Amino acid sequence: MQLQEIAQKLGCPYEGDPTLEIHGVASLAEARPGELSFLSEARYLPLLEQTQASAVIVEESLVLPRPIACLRGKDPRLLFAQAIELFYQPYRLPVGIHPTAVIDPSVELGEGVAIGPHVVVMEGVKIGDYTQIHPNVTIYPHVRVGSRCQLFANCVIHERTEIGDDCLIHSGAVIGDDGFGHIPLPDGSWRRMLQAGRVVLEDGVEVGSNTTIDRAAVGETRIGRGTKIDNLVQIGHGVKTGSHCLIVAQVGIAGSTQLGHHVILAGQCGLAGHLHIGDGVRVAAQTGVTSDVPAGQTVAGYPHQPIAEWRRSMAVQRHLPELQRALRKLEARVAKLEQNGGR
């Protein structure tokens, strides 16, 4: 594809030979001649000196240290994401039902649905138009799957789950399994509490590989529109998220906690149950959230605190050994003064 064609498809200006042939995309460090890369920030300019890329996507006003063909835009990373789609198309199953799939006669399939090898779809399921069900997926009874969804290999969708349009469920994810509900008995044992609720994924939700979203005991576990969930995340029963949240790998959210809109949970943070996290909250990696967080705050640490306070605490913590030595010296001096009657 020529440089001018790429610029036209992306709707951005370009500099350099309009007929320059581009056949792929790569990072600045790994690009080879004929490939397109991008530069998101000026601090990466040294990489531009060394790259073999034939063209780069850069910010509108960035001054380049050497002549190189380029595309310019306000958000180079977004343009690069769009450029990737010009050169790479993810695998799609052929439309139709593979002969090894087991489909209950009551299942309702929309137009252009693809169902791969060894898929099991149980009674009362409805699947929307152009949705793809990849190999070894199991869909339990009375599930609703919207249009243009992708359910990748080996994921499991439990009974009564509702999945909106344009959702991605990656390999190994489990949606709608029993919530973790157990009642202590007088003899010290535990009585399992049946989970009679369901999970709802609104439109445009993405669920990463080996993530689990448990169904509520009663009512719903609900993931808001456009929310993106990374791999290896555990979302407990009755959790509700607002729209367009971002939940990074290895996060755990205990039951009945509610997230507002546009909340970001960084990797390995944990949220206790029955909390309310306000709109726009950001939680730093490995933070332990133990109480409600007001809208707009950025928190870190365990237990969580405003990130500015946490940074000050960390600055002091690095000096604890020398502070301890100084304290011991002061204690020794005070003890000596007391022995000498204050002299």
From Swiss-Prot:
SUPFAM superfamilies: Trimeric LpxA-like enzymes (SSF51161). GO terms for biological process: lipid A biosynthetic process. GO terms for molecular function: N-acyltransferase activity; structural constituent of carboxysome shell. CDD domains: LbH_LpxD. Pathway: Bacterial outer membrane biogenesis; LPS lipid A biosynthesis. Keywords: Acyltransferase, Lipid A biosynthesis, Lipid biosynthesis, Lipid metabolism, Repeat, Transferase. It catalyses: a UDP-3-O-[(3R)-3-hydroxyacyl]-alpha-D-glucosamine + a (3R)-hydroxyacyl-[ACP] = a UDP-2-N,3-O-bis[(3R)-3-hydroxyacyl]-alpha-D-glucosamine + holo-[ACP] + H(+). InterPro entries: Hexapep (IPR001451), LpxD (IPR007691), Trimer_LpxA-like_sf (IPR011004), UDP_GlcNAc_AcTrfase_non-rep (IPR020573). NCBIfam families: lipid_A_lpxD (TIGR01853), PRK00892.1 (NF002060). Homotrimer. This is UDP-3-O-acylglucosamine N-acyltransferase. It comes from Synechococcus sp. (strain JA-3-3Ab).
